[in-house]
A protein has these predicted regions:
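Short aromatic-glycine-(Arg/Gly/Cys) micro-motifs in beta-strand/loop hairpins
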Residues: 1-5, 38-67
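A short, charged, amphipathic alpha-helix used as a generic interaction element across diverse proteins
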Residues: 1-5, 10-37
């Protein structure tokens, strides 16, 4: 069963892309499958903010689990 992922807010595209890449590499390196995308919205002051959203799937095979 996948785990929902949502983290942020980030106030620049560079920050949110760096966070997404860091999270992706961290979790795929230990065997998880990760689907991430960026979500852009506006805060209460009308500024653009971004979140990283997606799903993380548990390793399903013994090889993926490192067994």
């Amino acid at each position: 069963m996948p785990t929902d992922i949502r983290f942020g807010p980030f106030f620049s595209v560079g920050e949110v892309e760096m966070a997404r890449d860091e999270y992706y590499f961290k979790w795929t390196a230990i065997g998880y499958r990760v689907e991430l995308h960026l979500n852009e919205t506006m805060d209460d002051r009308g500024r653009r903010v971004w979140f990283v959203v997606g799903k993380r799937y548990e390793p399903t095979t013994r090889k993926e689990k490192g067994i």
